[in-house]
Design a protein with these regions (language model features):
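Divalent metal-coordination and catalytic microenvironments
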Residues: 21, 71, 97, 116, ...
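Transmembrane-helix bundle segments that line or gate the permeation/cavity pathway
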Residues: 38-47, 75-94, 113-136, 160-181, ...
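Interfacial and helix-entry/exit segments of alpha-helical transmembrane bundles
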Residues: 20-32, 102-117, 187-209, 275-290, ...
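Membrane-interface interhelical loops and short amphipathic "cap" helices
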Residues: 44-72, 100, 129-157, 216-248, ...
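Hydrophobic alpha-helical segments at protein termini of multi-pass membrane proteins
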Residues: 530-545, 552-562, 566-785
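Gly/Pro-rich turn-and-neighbor structural signature
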Residues: 32, 112, 179, 186-244, ...
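Extramembrane terminal tails and long inter-domain/linker segments of multi-pass membrane proteins
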Residues: 1-22, 50-59, 136-145, 184-188, ...
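Membrane-entry segments of alpha-helical transmembrane domains in multi-pass membrane proteins
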Residues: 20-34, 60-84, 102-109, 116, ...
Length: 785
């Protein structure tokens, strides 16, 4: 194979088609660096605009709004979160003794969806009217087509849809990896802090992303199809804020928890002591911080007129949720006390992250007060607060991780003097940029200019100088990275920090075998043999196709057509690879501790897929719940609704629902025949299930045609908007199920579903029964209420 390609082409193929978790981690890393360069440039433009009062003017109001909106989206969603994902992809399998992540192709698919989604988002800068300018939170109705008619908002929405898909796949993948792929001896008690924090992060993503996925879908529907979810007063701002902040507040912890994990690893190594009260810390994060982050999101909505009693409840919960954060800082301090502290670059950034996290946290406690929030919400005090958390704590913590793990990544040491200079300049200029914001209590955070008479000029000038210095100081980090990845300088010993972390026992030059030696935690020293994970083009092809589809919806049919062809080709190729067993997933001859999922001696690959299927369905349930919540919210705020039977053909819909229910019965008969080894009968029932599922879609399509004939369209108020969104989603799920069922039926016809091997059919039945259940719930909720 190597002789068939030139070295350059072979290198390109390797990085486009890799499914190895280490290489995927590096792709995440360098892509996040590319995005932070864009976000940092936008920050520089914003600070330059605010350096002096009017008439100083280098950006128009529109250009400034674009810079602010895209800066926030890029930094939070395309830089900080993916940088944490880079560490998780690379090091979690190493830390738990796994060969790779649970689903290597989906891991690659998740990365390429992230990259393509990010490209779609920033492509608005090249579109007529510019990029999105409704703020990084995309508040409706400002983000609607009425107030933001340019394509920028649509491109952001479409790119976000790809990103939400990426995050969902990534969260399922990493959770399954940690739950079921730990090596023998790697018990929960021995799990490294970074892996614990990764698990908590992915659980947050699994259950928070579906809400904003549904909200973004409704927003795109408003902008492209003419629905009115966020233009009608029954939905509008409050509906969007609920859907956004149910994701947005947990996202804060999604950003900071990987940084905390890296900080904990650094503290252990450079103090020579284990984490103080590690068990209590992990319990507090898992049982307080993670669940409470969903219950306090509405503290971002204190000024929206929500019930006063509800505000007090949220205020109290917010203060309770500070306890794990305080405990984390105390545990890190206690870890350092009495330790043999080595002030290397990783430790300096870790300590800086903890210090600024305290400042950011205390400033945030003020905002949790209903009374103070009314005074501070729209000011630069809030900007200072969240930058101390997102830049100070999260970015500094992740930079500590970079300096700690860089020798592992590259096999090279770096200049400690340059790294320390990077720390000193970053810490000084960071505080110079953001600390003065705490004094700008009267400056609105969404203005692009101001008058000299306000007295804000000196503060803004200092902040701008600090921002320039902070941006320039990051070139020191870039220099260190480029030198290390180019293998310039001194080679690193296998374990330069003398760490006890399991990730340091593997070969840094190996992209296949994580553990060439015996894994130390295994009770009897055994470890399963390694399997080469081949290159696979399907994740890249499908992601590129989806990206072109998104761009084509805005820029023209040619891109749309090319995207559809590429996407269909990629999906077909993925199924063909599976039918011909062309891709091998990493397996395990022995599983480690399996609690809370009982193994029962089941085939490991089947067991792994089963856990992943249940996790995906849990996320999909949250998605459907968010859509149902949207319907309930609208109905509660819009009592004037068409009478039952006045618009919809109830008998037809009831019959169609029964058709889909019947398909579940035929599928169960197919499973029973598969268990008994009756291949011909099984294929017959699978075909019947296909026919019934297809009939459901045809009847649903007829219902849409009938409604359009009555002039009941997407824009027919909230009744039309909710009808087409909910029936469209159920139809999309059925269509996806039929694609999977076609693949399974083909396997059955080929004789690859047998009495001993029918796990794929049984796992598919979980999804199909879930879809049927959702349609059964949809029928009374949409048609009979």
């Amino acid at each position: 194979m190597k002789e068939a390609y030139s070295p350059t082409l072979a290198w390109i193929r390797k990085w486009l088609f890799t499914t190895d978790h280490k290489e995927i981690g590096l792709l995440y890393f360098w892509t996040s660096i590319w995005f932070v360069a864009i976000g940092g440039a936008l920050a520089g433009l914003m600070r330059t605009q605010l350096a002096f009062p009017a008439p100083w003017d280098i950006l128009s109001a529109s250009a400034y709004n674009q810079a602010v909106s895209m800066h926030g989206l890029i930094m939070v969603l395309l830089f900080l979160s993916p940088l944490g994902a880079a560490f998780s992809n690379y090091f979690v399998p190493l830390q738990i003794g796994a060969k790779d992540v649970a689903y290597p192709r989906f891991n690659a698919f998740s990365y390429w969806m992230y990259l393509m989604g990010g490209i779609v988002m920033i492509s608005g800068f090249f579109a007529p009217g510019g990029a999105a300018q409704a703020g990084w939170t995309n508040y409706a109705p400002l983000s609607s087509i009425t107030f933001s008619p340019g394509p920028g908002e649509s491109l952001v929405g479409l790119g976000l849809m790809m990103l939400w898909g990426s995050l969902t796949m990534g969260s399922v993948n990493l959770i399954v990896t940690i739950l079921v792929m730990r090596a023998p001896g790697m018990t929960w008690k021995k799990l490294p802090p970074f892996t614990w924090m990764t698990l908590f992060t992915q659980l947050l993503l699994l259950f928070s992303v579906p809400s904003i996925f549904a909200g973004t879908l409704a927003l795109i529907s408003d902008r492209t199809l003419g629905t009115v979810f966020f233009l009608n007063p029954a939905g509008s701002t409050i509906l969007w804020e609920n859907m956004w902040w149910f994701f947005g507040h947990p996202e804060v912890y999604v950003v900071v928890l990987p940084a905390f994990g890296a900080i904990a690893e650094v503290m252990m190594v450079f103090t020579g002591r284990p984490i103080y009260a590690k068990k209590a810390l992990m319990i507090s994060v898992g049982l307080i911080m993670v669940p409470f982050s969903f219950s306090i999101y509405a503290h971002h909505m204190f000024l929206t007129g929500i019930n006063p009693l509800q505000r007090e409840f949220i205020d109290l919960n917010t203060e309770i949720n500070t306890l794990p954060s305080g405990l984390l800082v105390i545990c890190m301090i206690a870890t350092a006390i009495g330790g043999a502290i080595k002030f290397k670059a990783p430790l300096t950034f870790a300590l800086a992250a903890l210090a600024v996290f305290v400042i950011g946290g205390i400033s945030g406690v003020f905002d949790s007060s209903v009374l103070l929030d009314q005074e501070l919400r729209g000011t630069y005090q809030v900007v200072g607060h969240f930058h101390y958390i997102m830049v100070g704590a999260a970015e500094f913590g992740l930079i500590a991780g970079i300096y700690y793990w860089l020798p592992k990544w590259t096999g090279m040491m770096y200049s400690g003097a340059v790294a320390k200079l990077h720390f000193i300049t970053s810490f000084i200029f960071f505080n110079m940029t953001f600390f003065p914001m705490f004094y700008l209590l009267e400056m609105p955070r969404r203005v692009y200019t101001y008058l000299a008479s306000t007295g804000w000029g000196s503060y803004n000038f200092i902040e701008t100088l600090g921002a320039y210095g902070f941006i320039i100081s990051q070139f020191l980090l870039l220099y260190v990275l480029v030198e290390a990845f180019r293998h310039k300088g001194q080679p690193a010993p296998p374990n330069p920090w003398k760490s006890a972390g399991p990730e340091w026992t593997s070969d840094p030059k190996s992209y296949v075998d994580n553990y060439p030696a015996v894994y130390a935690s295994a009770p009897s020293g055994e470890h399963a043999p390694h399997v080469m994970t081949p290159l696979n083009s399907r994740p890249f092809t499908i992601s590129l196709g989806l990206g072109l589809i998104c761009l084509g919806l805005i820029f023209g049919w040619a891109l749309l057509g090319a995207g559809l062809i590429l996407g269909a080709y990629g999906i077909y190729g993925w199924a063909k690879d599976d039918l011909n067993s062309k891709f091998s997933m990493p397996g395990e001859e022995k599983a480690g501790e399996t609690w809370p999922f009982k193994h029962d001696g089941e085939n490991f690959g089947v067991w792994r897929m089963k856990v992943g299927t249940w996790l995906f369905l849990a996320s999909d349930l949250v998605f459907f719940s968010a859509v149902a919540g949207l319907l309930l919210f609208v109905r509660l705020h819009l009592p004037d609704w068409p009478a039952v039977g006045s618009v919809f053909d109830i008998p037809l819909v009831a019959f169609n629902t029964l058709v889909l229910i019947t398909s579940g019965l035929t599928l169960m008969l197919a499973i029973q025949d598969a268990k008994e080894g009756k291949a011909a009968s099984m294929t017959k029932w699978l075909t019947a299930t296909l026919v019934l599922g297809g009939s459901f879609l045809i009847i649903s399509g007829f219902e849409w045609v009938e409604q359009f004939a009555k002039n009941f369209t997407f824009s027919s108020g909230m009744p039309g908007s909710t009808f087409y969104l909910m029936t469209g989603l159920s139809g999309a799920h059925v269509f996806a199920g039929l694609l999977m069922l076609t693949y399974i039926t083909k396997k059955g016809i080929s004789g690859k579903i047998t009495k001993e091997n029918n796990s794929g059919l049984r796992l598919f039945s979980l999804f199909w029964m879930f879809v049927i259940a959702m349609v059964v719930v949809l029928f009374p909720a949409l048609y009979l209420m």
